[in-house]
Amino acid sequence: LVASEDRVYCRDANRQTFYYANISPQIGVFNQKYWAALEKQVQTWGRSTQQSVYDKVYVTKGGTINKLLTNFTGTLKANDQLYPTTDADGKTVRGLIVPAYYYMAILSEKNGVYKTIGFYVPHAETLPQKPTADDFLVYAVSIDKLEQETGIDFFCNLPNEIEKTVEATYSADDWAW
């Protein structure tokens, strides 16, 4: 899930953010408030490479397909003035699966030293609408925990010893909040 703002360096790259392969049903207030704020925080880390905070920042984002938002009825109307709903199988009325969680796996590198942090966020209307760093840290997890929850092997191209070490834990102090 690449945000449009992540791809402002050229028109074609930005257009790619609107492909169907980059779309996932999200509760409006979740997308527009909490998730957007988390994306902006991560964008500041990516853009801080120019200030030499990090040399590189790698980000993987998505929604769970192994855990779906079942039997959901929203309390806030969507743009079409309907309440968002899912059935017992976690699908919308049009048959789209709706993730119960959205995640980010983030890896930074500075002078050959790697740091990671993951976020495993419940797809909900009730998250803070003006989240702070502390609000984000409620859902911060190690990459190992994120891999356990999603079934995805993140950063598998790192040398095994580095991957094993950096994915085991995270420290909020490693990130420029």
Q: What would you call each of these model-derived segments?
A:
Residues 1-177:
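Domain-level detector of nuclease and nuclease-like folds
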